[in-house]
Amino acid sequence: MAPLQLAFVNFTKGSYIIVEGKRNADRFFIIRQGNVRLSKGVQIVAEEQGDTLGPGDFFGVVSTMSGHSHIETAQALSDVTLISVQKEQFSQLIQSNAPVAMKIILQFSKRVRYLDEALTRLTLKSNAVEDPSHIFNVAEYYAKQNQYNLAFFAYHNYIKYCPQGENAGLAKERMKKIAPFIKNLKLDHNPNEMLRTYAKNSMIFCEGEPGDELYIIQKGAVKIAKVVDNNEVLLAVLKSGDIFGEMALLESKPRAAGAIAYEDCQLMAVNRENFKQMIQSQPQLIARLTTLLAERIWLIYKQLANTQINDPLGRMYDALQIQLEKKKVDISNTVTFMFDFGPKELSNMVGLAESDGRMVVRKMMENRNFQVVNDKIFVKDVKEVGRQTAYFMKMQQLEKARKEKSSTVNYF
């Protein structure tokens, strides 16, 4: 393999290096000298690392690795010298400079967790709970849903991680009560066994429990969900080749969400020791993990901006557009599209109660371009999603401008 050759680029003070919304993200930058300021059109939450970057910091990685439009604008605060890294050079960068690659991955992981907590607060009006004691609440939820295998697994893990917990005795009683209904449940796997199989509706891990492994899906599908205020919130359905569980491994923090086999599946489990070895031996895997984290960050930023749309119908149209952009569907073309979720999940995405969501969906269905087919949302022309989203965004901007103007009127 040829040695890694990175280019140095210079920008004068005041220059715009990347611009939010532009779809030209084919490289990211590491600051060698000088300072750069990041800004966003819609600033929902303050970034943990701040908006001023210096030598050793990097920017543009999210959009470059995810293949989406830029989510921020970068402007030189002084004359700057930057190291330019093209997307296809990232695997080489991992092999030649593992510390830089790990810095990117660790920062991304922290960023995902931080932004996900902010999104939970804004959409679900609740704080995320990342503590083993929460496992009991998860177990109680699934028991009430008559999903006894999931409940038994969660009760078992609550006792495992909180043996002296205030609900330990109650958890044991619950386990005895539902034991007759348990079918083909496997509670533990050999930690030395990298390839593992899980039957449909089996719990792989529970939110709130410690985690020291990430998983790569070899076959099947996995549902990522969390229980908030006695409701299950679907976060994602992952397919073959996807990676999950990496944040707990990288940060040594409790699982932020639970993982359940959506279909019969086979997973490869990677522990910390194996992960360190893979950084050098399998740079493509680390590049894939970086891409995955970048896609999550991009998606959460879009979802955070969605929370600022006042009209619930506008939020729904925007949520559909986000999903189309996520799948890289060109909404400038007249094509049909079947979403892999229905009205209930769409209401959940925009933080509406099921009853409120049904009313808004009925209003959406008055537009003949939209239908519900086999409990999935179907659109006859994806351009209509873009048109409706643009309309509601324009109305939002006009309303904001009107309020700002009225607040600055001077009365004599």
Where are these regions (language model features)?
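Regulatory nucleotide-sensing modules
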Residues: 1-41, 178-231, 240
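TPR-adjacent "capping" and linker segments in tetratricopeptide-repeat scaffold/adaptor proteins
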Residues: 117-134, 187-188
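Alpha-helix N-cap/N′ positions at the starts of helices
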Residues: 9-12, 85, 127-137, 196-199, ...
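Cyclic-nucleotide recognition modules
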Residues: 48-105, 236-290, 298
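Phosphate-/nucleic-acid-contacting segments
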Residues: 131-178, 312, 319, 325-412
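Short, Lys/Arg-enriched, Trp-marked, Pro/Gly-tolerant hinge/linker segments that flank
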Residues: 121-127, 300-312, 330-333
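Short, structured interface segments
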Residues: 93, 98-120, 165-182, 286-296
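Charged, long alpha-helical assembly modules
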Residues: 166-214, 226-227, 232, 237, ...
